[in-house]
Amino acid sequence: AGVVTGLAWTAVGGEILFIETSLSRSKAPRLTLTGNLGDVMKESAILALEYVKAHASMLDIDYRLFEQWSVHVHVPEGATPKDGPSAGITIATSLASAFTQRKVRANTAMTGEITLRGRVLPVGGIKEKILAAKRAGIKNIIMSKENEKDIQEIKSSYVDGLQFFFVENVQDVFNIALLKERVDNPLDLTIKEESAENK
């Protein structure tokens, strides 16, 4: 749970990146971000967590979990600097998967900026990201509806064999990317009730 594939654009072209979320029980929960992330990407992670918190009931997440579990979001290859808003939906999906322990759809990658209200905004570098997805053997790609025109401008040979999901909000992303099925050996996300003497 909590590992999702994103698509990034770099100076040397497109690449796939993985977003990993892990949870640990804590008396003073906090959000930790690692992987050499720039300020804009850090803001995306904060936004994504706020969105998941605000829509906890829709995801069947007990809100008290946020008060008892710390969140660690990591983007591997820490030596490579990463920035930009396009990982917003990827981070949100990673968080939702971690807090629900639901599996993430296989062979699926995504790219898109999110707003606090959950809108999915278009991002750049689409052609390069598509080529990176193809190289990695990814079949399903989720992106903003407003990026649909970019796909239509790409040579058809580049997009053959790919299925695109064009979304308008983060809930659409979750509906596509998160399976109903829980992961094997799910994390025990039970709520620790305060004992009488602590109250």
PLM feature spans:
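Peripheral, non-AAA+ core regions of ATP-driven protein-machinery
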Residues: V3-T5, V12-K199
